[in-house]
Amino acid sequence: MLTTIRSIQKNDNSPLAKIVRQVMEEFGVNLPNTVYTDPTTDHLFELFQKDRAVYNVAEVDGKIVGGGGIYPTDGLPDGVCELVKMWLLPEARGLGLGRTMIEKCLQQAKELGFNKVYLESMPELKQALRIYEKFGFEYLNAQMGNSGHTGCQKWMIKVL
């Protein structure tokens, strides 16, 4: 089994949008005001052309199984980026890909000059929240920035 992580390409838009929505449905978090209904979910390649934004695609044996990135979300304080759209299909879990993706994103955030990484999640995503805690993310009492994803009820931040 060959696992790879690479930069997003334009032809990844459709498979990645399907993965995001499939995983959200799996956990019952396919709700309004989340990435599930966000129109940018269908155009990730274009979204991540923004300066200081990076999106990584995870593959197993050449098949796209997920992705995740960092993004300079509007309204975040200077030096803070957001860990965004981190999703893996069920068959990709337990392979260490999630951990590798987060490590890569944190390293990319540092290289791009960020000193903190913020994220938004949901209580239903218990396994993801535990992984973020292991990486040193700490819970916040309120949302930061203007992601527009008011359907998320868990907010975390990590100092790099």
Q: Which sequence ranges carry the predicted segments?
A:
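Active-site acidic-Proline motif in GNAT/NAT acetyltransferases
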Residues: 89-91, 95, 123-124
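Residues that form or flank phosphate/diphosphate-binding pockets in enzymes
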Residues: 78, 96, 127
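Acetyl-CoA-dependent GNAT
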Residues: 3, 7-91, 102-104, 108, ...
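Residue-level signal for short amphipathic helical patches enriched in basic/charged
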Residues: 11, 112, 120
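Short coil/turn segments at alpha/beta junctions that flank glycine-rich nucleotide-binding fingerprints
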Residues: 95, 111-115
